[in-house]
Amino acid sequence: MTPPDAEDLVASVTCEEAVLLNQGAQDDEGEPLPRLAAIDCGIKYNILRELCRRFEVVWCPASLDFDSIVSEWQPDALFASNGPGDPAHPGDATSARESLAAAVRAEMPVMGICLGHQLMGLAAGLRTYKLRYGHRGANQPVVDLQTGRVNITSQNHGFAVEDPDKGMLAPHPSGARSEIGENALGTDFEVRHINANDRTVEGLDLVGKPAFTIQFHPEACPGPHDASPLFDRFSDMVSEHLADAQRALVRGGER
């Protein structure tokens, strides 16, 4: 029997072609919402609902490369979803990882959730590995190292991103792990969130870039909504990035 981790599970659950979900979406003041390319690695519908409240969303297959996403859809930001399987699998998960890294290098705002977080970790040069005990359920405590706040989160994953200082925490006896890679992001990163139970990495912030990731599911339904403001954090990040770009354009025209 083929081990589940050997299959390209992302390819089996991603959408078949890119679709614009809510064309012409506007905010409460009638202004157009920013356009977001959401890479589907097995995305949950409630994540799409949360994104569509804040963005005009292009739902993209994981195999669609970054250059094609940009040329065909001209997004303002990029999102990588949750999904099944080994994040280091050489199939569609790797394609999604390459798109994430390219978006970061292009200074595009990026957010990753669950598998998307693990893909960003791999792109940053960190290893991913199988946990001894996967995080399952709606009562996983996560510490925000910047604010000290503890959120109760919903999680369902068996792999984790290694800590850049402490290495692999609570690994599985099988030793399943990815190879050591290089940082393909063009910037450094810092650990923002950790699991309060086993201290494993739960979120990364990229230094000097409008990008961050989280391992948990902020949109869980049913489940805790402590972390749902993270979608607002990303929305604000995108709006600020677009405003900065507009100001730079105006300054350039005045010279």
Residue ranges of each PLM-predicted region?
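Active-site-proximal beta-strand elements of phosphoester/diester hydrolases
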Residues: 35-40, 153-154, 212-216
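Generic structural signal for residues in well-ordered beta-strands
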Residues: 57-59, 128, 191
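Flexible loop residues that form catalytic
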Residues: 83, 209, 219
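Catalytic beta-strand/loop cores that center a nucleophilic Ser/Cys/Thr
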Residues: 149-208, 254-255
